[in-house]
Amino acid sequence: MRRSTKLQRLLVFGLIGPIVGLNVWLLTQVYRYFEHLITLLAIAAILAFLLNYSVRFFERARMTRTQAVTVVLLATFTLLVILGVTLVPLLIEQATQLLERIPAWLEASRNNLQSLDSWAKARNLPLDLQGITGRISGQIESQLQTLAAQALSFALGTVSGLIDGTLVLVLAFYMLLYGDRLWNGLIQFLPPHIGIPLGISLRLNFQNFFISQLLLAVFMTAVLIPIFLVLKVPFALLFALVIGIAELIPFIGATLGIGLVTLLLLLQDVGLAAWVGVSATIMQQVRDNVLAPRMMGSFTGLNPIVILIALLVGLQVAGFLGVVVAVPIAGTIKGTLDAMYGTKQTAGVATEIVPRNL
């Protein structure tokens, strides 16, 4: 009997890994099949989360929910149209000019490094700047070819992009109207000690995270544009927007954005690149040490190692969108588990929390 019991335990533990791996693989295949639909739903859900604060503001002004949602979405659509007419053409023009100028920048930087390499060889210094430059230039040129191909496909897919944008707005409209009913219906299928903490944690993590990240990204973009204009940085608007969009990636986004812009400017002017890197880093420190703690606090409570793992998993599964939603999902899981253990230890906590948060 003891041997059979031990054998059963070994079989159970031995099958756990393959079963979990098979389930993960099946979920990955399902995601790949419905990737476009899931992406649209995720973007619409994020937009609904962000706009829900504005909807509540208009509801306090004695508007009905439908009227408030309609006003907010019309204002959002108007803002997007204004940005699309004024800002997007300028960004496309600057991006096109940047792609055209980078080969000339590469040639100029190659010539400068050749003279520096000759100076190092004349003094018997063990430097191979020319070889390093050749490898870096090859990598940049290959990436430029990829970007050019992606730009062409983006131009060809403009119509489908407009259709997707319309679908996102329509989905966000119905999510703002009926999302609570749908979510509460799904939560009811879960046991109360799981469903209630999950709903609270999801709402807190996603709303706090996305609103904070969006405001911090807007801050970086708005502050860096005049700084870059004063420094006479070429493509100031484009570079500031690149850093601002990179800010949406938690933990490492600012470093990636500033590093990319500084690297591109190094090809043209070392002094200008240094000024840009220093000024952007100072603004990043202001953001991280002054604004971010006030806006975000430590609501996720996640270890930095867990954040990095979540970012890598999100990147592998869903690309940029996965990176953006990885941290709030991880924070939701942790918050739910913490609340579940708390409700087990303290009776009646869930019934006290729900009316204040939902």
Question: Regions from the language model: what does each represent?
Answer:
Residues R3, S54-A61, Q67, L74, ...:
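Juxtamembrane membrane-interface segments in integral membrane proteins
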Residues Y33-L40, D164, I187, V230-L241, ...:
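Membrane-water interface of transmembrane alpha-helices in multipass transporters/channels
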Residues A44-A48, A172, L241-L248, I252-T255, ...:
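Hydrophobic transmembrane alpha-helices
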Residues A273-L358:
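Hydrophobic alpha-helical transmembrane segments of membrane transport and translocation systems
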